[in-house]
Structure formats: structure tokens, C-alpha cells
């Protein structure tokens, strides 16, 4: 499971797109969940379908590194295009 400290963490690079779905949680409080479904790439350029959510709409055409552990997205952070490994960058 995702709490298993022995389970490896995998990183995938994605270029942000429009959300695939916007879920209204509380319209009065302006609270939404943005769902993203994209192809992510490992540092070696291997592709994988990545599903992740955000509590704010992400800017399009920005680069993220998404961390996955035991088939669960645990985090993501924005990275510069120059920090993306070449094989992943070629696919994005």
C-alpha cells in the first residue's frame, strides 16, 4: 500500500493540459477539484497514463514531475523544461 516505506516511488514528467473534468465541491466557497488525465514519461522516456487531481486549476503548458507510489499519486511539483531528462523531454 502507499504507506509501505519499502514500496518504490516512481517519477513521471508531464506537460500540463486542460483538466479532463472539473468537480464542484462547494460553489459558494469557490472550491473545486480539477482532474487531469495525461501521458507521463519516466526519465528513460517510458510512457504511462497518469491521473491526478489539484485543488486549483493548473496553468497549461507547464511542466510537472509527478510522484507515484503503489499506483497512487503522492505529489507533484512544477519543474523547468531544462530540468527534465532528455528522453522524457523528447516525448513531451
Where are these regions (language model features)?
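Short extracytoplasmic
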Residues: 5-39
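Structured, soluble extracytoplasmic/luminal domains of envelope-associated proteins
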Residues: 42-92
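Gram-positive cell-envelope targeting signals
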Residues: 1-3
